[in-house]
Amino acid sequence: MALLQISEPGMAPAPHQRRLAVGIDLGTTNSLVAAVRNSVPEVLPDEAGRALLPSVVRYLEKGGRRIGHEAKEQAATDPRNTIVSVKRFMGRGKAEVEGAANAPYEFVDAPGMVQIRTIDGVKSPVEVSAEILATLRYRAEDTLGDELVGAVITVPAYFDDAQRQATKDAARLAGLNVLRLLNEPTAAAIAYGLDNAAEGLYAVYDLGGGTFDLSILKLTKGVFEVLAAGGDSALGGDDFDHVLFGHVLAQAGIDAKALAPEDVRLLLDRVRVLKEALSSAPQASLDVTLSNGARLVQTISHDTFASLVEPLVQRTLTPTRKALRDAQVTPADIKGVVLVGGATRMPVIRDAVAKYFGQPPLVNLDPDQVVALGAAIQADLLAGNRGSGDDWLLLDVIPLSLGVETMGGLVEKIIPRNSTIPIARAQEFTTFKDGQTAMAIHVVQGERELVADCRSLARFELRGIPPMTAGAARIRVTYQVDADGLLSVFAREQHSGVEASVVVKPSYGLADDDIAKMLEDSFKTAEIDMRARALREAQVEAQRMIEATQAALSADGELLDDAERTQVDALVAALRTIAQGDDADAIETATKALADGTDEFAARRMDKSIKRALSGRRLDEI
């Protein structure tokens, strides 16, 4: 007999008229999804109660894949087809990731963003990220019981335009409507500020698996104003792993290049466990058997680890000092330092932050969850679910200056870094030669003075300029950055009115045709995805049915005679065996058989409960 499920008081889903939106922290190591439910932001766990989804995708033959925990478990045995830390490759070209430390992948030499060859074909970081985002989307829709109107996705504050566009492309591929790209430190400040009614100057120190950000924020009466942001989009907890990895190999006299890819991934996984153990113990041990039978046994002290990673710790303080200078404040002006990212659990980080700012950091919110919670608050607001206490304002900034190439390969900055967004700025330029009728406009991003040292974002031409003497034409170039930190550029010749514009699709972004092809490919694999999803749902329901039956037998097994008990036990055993297979229909059939086979038992339990409730009571009391 099927039983209806009723939620606890106050925990029922929000009313149907509420527009469902979520916050997603797309992390290097782990990703999370959160939503505001009953006016409280909360992280949404999977069916096993796990909040964190490992940012790992394993590709199989014939279009299959495993995502999250299942993929992570196979990373050491199938490293070439199991993509980890893909966030480090977002918006990056092959030349920029070629030296990726100990990466076991085969990078493909293709124009634009780096590609990775797998057993299921060549994949871009956008496609891999889309798999993770889609998994979080399904989790949210299953938990909330309806489709999402959109999501706020967090990105490192120091992500450039190419990396932001790649993130937005991944969301589009995953079927998500992006309400806003939100800087991770800002999201953390929202969660922390609203949770603690904080005011004053705060620093958000965000060290994740692959990126580092430091933001200075001013919180006053519901206004979150980012004064400055700095960071390093190629520095994170992974780098601490690689330093420890190198030390372990050096102590053992092993050349990393001589290791099989499987051993590299196995060692990196074990080294990460070792690093985490050193966060709570003065020393920790490593015991690994490699594929060739060689055994590595080492004990490393926390002091040794601290000295090994000291250069990385100092690398985080360099952009910290820069951000403080940009905000024109000193460490003494900072009221509190909020730690974000799992890597900030390392004592060596907490000690360095405390020493630099002269105060212990704030750690009352989970550093793994705080970004997703802040994004959920912003998503709920952008979806139109404004409630009491929601009259707050967010003022974010761009992390890197935007400029245009001028003669001689120089950069003229149009919008300086740390400008509040959204923003539009314009500047006039002129022609270089007599009779010049066209102008090439090269859009760049960065702080250096030479174009060669900055990132190229886009190129376009303004044609139809009336022929004039050099310096007579007036071309007004306008840069416009939206709330996501994405750029559009417009050029207009003032005399003739001729115009040209470009919505910046970075050199390492994806063309619309590429997105369309990926969407088409995703449709082709949709059946595989749905089968995998149906199988997982059937297995979860089977396990629920088995546990419910066993609990009932423990409580009221005496209601069955020996023959009936034997029959129920056989049905449970059959379902347990079938649930380990991959036939969803067979699992559903076996689950139904157990449900049908225990109908009479359920009825007897109900009768017993009623009799117990009525025992000793008179008719007129009922």
UniProtKB/Swiss-Prot annotation:
ATP-binding is among the record's keywords: yes
InterPro entries per record: ATPase_NBD, Heat_shock_70_CS, HscA_NBD, HSP70_C_sf, HSP70_peptide-bd_sf, Hsp_70_fam, ISC_FeS_clus_asmbl_HscA
Pfam families with a match to the protein in the record: HSP70
Keyword Secreted attributed: no
A GO biological-process term: iron-sulfur cluster assembly
Keyword field: ATP-binding, Chaperone, Nucleotide-binding
Domain of life: Bacteria
GO molecular function, one term: unfolded protein binding
SUPFAM superfamilies xref list: Actin-like ATPase domain, Heat shock protein 70kD (HSP70), C-terminal subdomain, Heat shock protein 70kD (HSP70), peptide-binding domain
HAMAP family membership: HscA
Family: Belongs to the heat shock protein 70 family.
Primary role: Chaperone involved in the maturation of iron-sulfur cluster-containing proteins. Has a low intrinsic ATPase activity which is markedly stimulated by HscB.
Name this polypeptide is given: Chaperone protein HscA homolog
Organism expressing this protein natively: Burkholderia ambifaria (strain MC40-6)
